[in-house]
Design a protein with these regions (language model features):
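Reductase modules of NAD(P)H-dependent flavoproteins
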Residues: 1-79, 84-85, 228, 232-327
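Short, surface-exposed secondary-structure boundary micro-motifs
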Residues: 50-53, 90-92, 135, 187
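Ferredoxin-reductase
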Residues: 95-181, 198-199, 235-237, 262-266
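A short, basic/flexible loop-to-alpha-helix module at the beginning of a structural domain
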Residues: 186-198
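Conserved beta-strand elements of the Class I
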Residues: 201-202, 293
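Histidine-anchored nucleotide/phosphate-binding helix
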Residues: 210, 214-222
Length: 327
């Protein structure tokens, strides 16, 4: 059965099948509701139910505070209509940028650094991500965080992990060449450095979740800020790591930056560093007065946040970007 969806304040209307979530239905009708992961992990598609009946599907619980739930807020990529609905939802401009691949550099056995040069300046804030259209499939997009803060070169840098069967990552690893064109959507996301405090920073990054964390640390360095930063960077096995030399150079050059690399594979005897699951970092109890930044898979982030909250870290001091496999 289909229902009419009305978005406020834009007044845009479209039909949605009861089996479609709101974001899917909007895309089908050419309506660009702001969203990110499309899997209930990031919270970019928060909206408010103004009237009508709906069913909320599963999402990461911490995305909505109790006060937000009470106010009728919902995660639209997991919201299904059960009657006509009026929703307050952000509709984003359909701005796109044409870019050119300037470099493809292997970082690890399954990670590439992708550098793009946009035809026009591409505005973004450190920590945000861009949506990239899959070549030959203009209706399909993949989201990746920028790995550097905005700079005078204008180049955009991404860390892309190859996923078996991932349409975009397979094209990038096996077909793409320097000079190929890619289309980007406008930058999105609220994951960013808090500008109004000088609290010590705890950063936890898993895999290519290192990208926006690196960008934040680079920005902090460029601004001349010297508040202590402790980065825990985790991977499953040693071969999954990348940028270890660059991170080590930061810790040598800047005394306020501490880097701890840790493996979750306890059987890797060749690794002489730390062996621990990333969420257990949060259990040490030393982070109560820190500003915390996490980026990685939803399971890691949920577990880490639960531990942080249980050790008296304030909810509003925790910032995260959770991403599902994206290839």
């Amino acid at each position: 059965m289909e229902y009419e969806i009305c978005l406020e304040p834009s007044g845009i209307r479209f039909m949605a099948d009861e089996r479609q979530n709101i974001v899917e239905a909007a895309k089908q009708h050419g309506v660009a509701i702001k969203y990110g992961c499309a899997s209930g992990s990031c919270g970019d598609c928060k909206g408010t139910i103004l009237s009508g009946a709906s069913e909320q599907g599963p999402f990461m619980p911490l995305l909505l505070l109790p006060t937000e739930r009470a106010a009728g807020m919902a995660i639209l990529c997991k919201l299904y209509p059960r009657s006509d609905l009026r929703l307050h939802a952000e509709v984003v401009p359909k701005d796109t940028w044409m870019t050119e691949i300037t470099r493809l550099t292997p970082l690890a056995w399954n990670v590439l650094e992708l550098r793009l040069r946009p035809e026009w300046p591409y505005p973004y804030r450190t920590g945000q991500y861009a949506r990239i259209a899959i070549p030959g499939r203009p209706d399909q997009w993949r989201s990746y965080s920028m790995a550097t803060p905005p700079d005078t070169t204008g180049e955009l840098v991404f860390h892309i992990r190859e996923l078996p069967g991932g349409v975009f990552s397979q094209w990038l690893f096996h077909t793409a060449q320097r000079g190929d064109a890619l289309t980007l959507g406008a930058a999105q996301g609220e994951f960013a450095l808090s500008p109004d405090n000088d609290r010590d920073m705890l950063c936890i990054a898993a895999g290519t979740g290192l990208a926006p964390i690196e960008a934040m640390i680079q920005e902090s360095i460029a601004l001349g800020r010297t508040r202590p930063i402790h980065l825990f960077y985790g991977a499953r096995k040693r071969a999954d790591f990348y940028h270890l030399e660059e991170l080590a150079r930061w810790s040598r050059q800047y005394p306020h930056i501490t880097i701890t690399s840790t493996l979750s594979d306890m059987q890797d005897a060749s690794w002489t560093g730390a062996h621990r699951l990333l969420p257990t970092v949060a259990a040490s109890g030393h982070w109560k007065d820190h500003e915390v930044y996490l980026c990685g898979n939803p399971g890691m982030i949920e577990a880490a946040i639960d531990l942080l909250l249980s050790h008296d870290v304030r909810h509003d001091h925790i910032h995260f970007d959770a991403f599902a496999p994206n290839g």
